[in-house]
């Protein structure tokens, strides 16, 4: 088991006995984060970024780590989330393997990796850990919390559980809960990992582990992150070269789209812990904003009770994983609570991953919204 920690990561310790929503507690746990841009004297220009399932806290390049970040085109000087104006905090999710405590981390009580002894993880736990991190950094109120994909779920949980912590919200391809299609896909991803003999009931060590399962899981995921329209335009029925086909043997990859999936799945499997994948994926399926909390009314009621002044809600029309109807639900619920909400459906072939790869369409509305907030 391995953790994959970016070199510029900083850490905030969680309080001992950090209670997990579905039972259990963590001791000696920590949250990894990175910051970009300067905090002003009033400490009121902080923007929190909550990530999807796989990213680390390295959203953008920094002087002490010039490696391009996973959101390099969105975060930085003069970019839509302008670090000349904003102090951006990107938090690695609790349960991940990118610096925050998760199944691959060492349990201080045993000196061994947690593996499956790590408590059941919830999106609410991720939100609570992020809220603790913000307060530990001396920030009592965020100018904005930005959440994309799973991070959109985490942001909504944070706003519900810590209503005074953020003034505004940007939701990019988020959701108040997972729909059956998304649950089915992630269920198959987890099954692929658990069915791999190398998983060993979570007790694999460094080395191969359930690599074949991880490759299949990632390929399944990538099929849902983009759209059929993009696959058609990008690959068509183009075949790989004769020599490459011969190297693969009978029934091996023949089309460029297969080669693309394999390349990116191999790269992902090299740098993500399978147990972390299982925990985070399961947390997404279990999340429902309408569960728990007082007030009733399900998810719409929870959204209407959030205390944000403004919100920007964006989603791709081609997103099959977190479809546009879920973005409309978020916008309607926040608006019912009195927030000034901008809802922007985006025409893009990039599907769910559009917030990552189609900055031409997602960037300007984000920049415009933050200019109003400033």
From Swiss-Prot:
Involved in the biosynthesis of the antibiotic D-cycloserine (DCS), a cyclic structural analog of D-alanine, used as an antitubercular agent. Catalyzes the transfer of the acetyl group from acetyl-CoA to the hydroxyl group of L-serine to yield the activated serine, O-acetyl-L-serine. It prefers L-serine over L-homoserine. InterPro entries: AB_hydrolase_1, AB_hydrolase_fold, HAT_MetX-like. It is found in: Cytoplasm. It catalyses: L-serine + acetyl-CoA = O-acetyl-L-serine + CoA; L-homoserine + acetyl-CoA = O-acetyl-L-homoserine + CoA. The record marks 52, 55 as: Important for substrate specificity. Homodimer. The keyword Transferase applies. Belongs to the AB hydrolase superfamily. MetX family. Its EC number is 2.3.1.30, 2.3.1.31. GO terms for cellular component: cytoplasm. HAMAP family: MetX_acyltransf (MF_00296). One of its GO terms (molecular function) is O-succinyltransferase activity. Keywords: Acyltransferase, Amino-acid biosynthesis, Cytoplasm, Transferase. Residues 46-357 form the AB hydrolase-1 domain. GO terms for biological process: cysteine biosynthetic process from serine; homoserine metabolic process; methionine biosynthetic process. Signal peptide: none annotated. Disulfide bonds: none annotated. The active site is at residues 149, 319, 352. Pathway: Antibiotic biosynthesis. It is an enzyme of class 2 (transferase). Coiled coil: none annotated. The keyword Acyltransferase applies. This is L-serine/homoserine O-acetyltransferase. Changing residue 55 to G: Can acetylate both L-serine and L-homoserine. Utilizes L-homoserine as a substrate for acetylation but barely utilizes L-serine.
């Amino acid at each position: 088991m391995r953790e994959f920690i970016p070199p510029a990561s900083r850490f905030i310790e969680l309080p001992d006995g950090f209670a997990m929503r579905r039972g259990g507690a963590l001791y000696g746990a920590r949250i990894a984060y990175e910051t970009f841009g300067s905090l002003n004297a009033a400490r009121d220009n902080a923007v929190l970024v909550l990530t999807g399932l796989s990213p680390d806290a390295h959203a953008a390049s920094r002087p002490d780590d010039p490696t391009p970040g996973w959101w390099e085109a969105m975060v930085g000087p003069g970019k839509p989330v302008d670090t000349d104006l904003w102090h951006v905090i990107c938090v690695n999710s609790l349960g991940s393997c990118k610096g925050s405590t998760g199944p691959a981390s060492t349990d201080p009580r045993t000196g061994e990796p947690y593996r499956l002894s790590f408590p059941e993880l919830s999106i609410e736990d991720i939100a609570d850990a992020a809220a603790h991190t913000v307060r530990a950094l001396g920030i009592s109120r965020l100018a904005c919390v930005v959440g994309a994909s799973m991070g959109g779920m985490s942001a909504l949980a944070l706003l519900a559980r810590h209503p005074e912590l953020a003034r505004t919200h940007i939701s990019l391809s988020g959701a108040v809960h997972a729909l059956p299609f998304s649950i089915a896909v992630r269920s198959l991803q987890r099954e692929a990992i658990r069915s791999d003999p190398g998983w060993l009931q979570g007790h694999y060590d460094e080395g191969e582990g359930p690599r074949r399962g991880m490759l299949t899981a990632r390929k399944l995921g990538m099929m849902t992150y983009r759209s059929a329209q993009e696959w058609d335009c990008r690959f068509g029925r183009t075949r790989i070269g004769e020599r490459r086909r011969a190297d693969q043997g009978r029934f091996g990859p023949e089309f460029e789209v297969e080669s693309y999936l394999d390349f990116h799945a191999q790269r992902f499997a090299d740098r993500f812990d399978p147990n972390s994948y299982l925990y985070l994926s399961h947390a997404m399926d279990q999340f429902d904003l309408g569960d728990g909390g007082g007030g009733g009314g399900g998810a719409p009621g929870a959204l209407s009770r959030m205390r944000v002044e403004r919100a920007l809600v964006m989603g791709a029309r081609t997103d099959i994983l977190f479809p546009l109807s879920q973005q409309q639900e978020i916008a309607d619920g926040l608006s019912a609570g009195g927030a000034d909400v901008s809802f922007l459906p985006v025409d893009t072939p990039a599907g769910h991953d559009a917030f990552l790869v189609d900055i031409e369409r997602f960037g300007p509305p984000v920049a415009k919204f933050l200019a109003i907030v400033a």
